[in-house]
Design a protein with these regions (language model features):
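Long C-terminal interaction/binding lobes of large macromolecular proteins
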Residues: 1-31, 36
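Intrinsically disordered, low-complexity segments enriched in polar/charged residues with Gly/Pro
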Residues: 7-10, 30, 58-59, 65-68
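Solvent-exposed beta-strand/loop surfaces of large extracellular or lumenal domains
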Residues: 12, 17, 52-58
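Short, flexible, mixed-charge glycine/proline-rich loop motifs
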Residues: 30-40, 69-76
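Short, conserved catalytic/metal-binding motifs centered on acidic residues
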Residues: 32, 43, 81
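Cys/His-rich Zn2+-binding cysteine-cluster or related metal-binding knuckle/ribbon modules and their
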Residues: 36, 40, 53, 57-60
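Extended Gly/Ser/Thr-rich low-complexity repeat segments
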Residues: 38, 42-48
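Short, positively charged, Gly/Tyr-enriched micro-motifs
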Residues: 47-50, 59-118
Length: 118
């Protein structure tokens, strides 16, 4: 996927491999729907090249925009290991957007820490 269509919205994240698919304006918040560029991924257990196995929606809290809360709905990839002898059958994508099982984006955490230090 190219940034040609989503370039202005993608620039807000400042992450080159995150694409903004939609921005939804609710009554009290913005929801930004994103997904990442699919890299080649090896199984974390056996290092065999994994294949895509669908997506899971992960809701993250991000920085507010113009005083309005922002949520990020990340269409996180699920991968499947093709090695029969491997003890891991599926695993999820890791990305700098958020920590594993995190509820905040990494930039929201950095902003909050900076606010506490100032």
């Amino acid at each position: 996927m190219s940034h040609a269509i989503c370039a202005p919205a993608c620039a807000l994240f400042d992450l080159p491999d995150v694409h903004v698919l939609a921005v939804e304006r609710g009554a009290r918040q913005f929801t930004v729907v994103v997904e990442t560029v699919p890299p080649l991924v090896g199984c974390p257990s056996c290092a065999v090249l994994a294949t895509g196995h669908g997506r899971r929606k992960v809701l993250l809290h991000d920085l507010p925009c113009a005083g309005v809360p922002v949520r990020v709905r990340w269409r996180k990839r699920i991968y499947r290991c093709l090695e029969d002898a491997c003890e891991i059958s599926t695993f999820s994508e890791l990305h700098e957007l958020a920590a594993p099982r995190g509820k905040l984006t990494t930039r929201a955490i950095a902003w909050a820490v900076a606010q506490l230090r100032s």
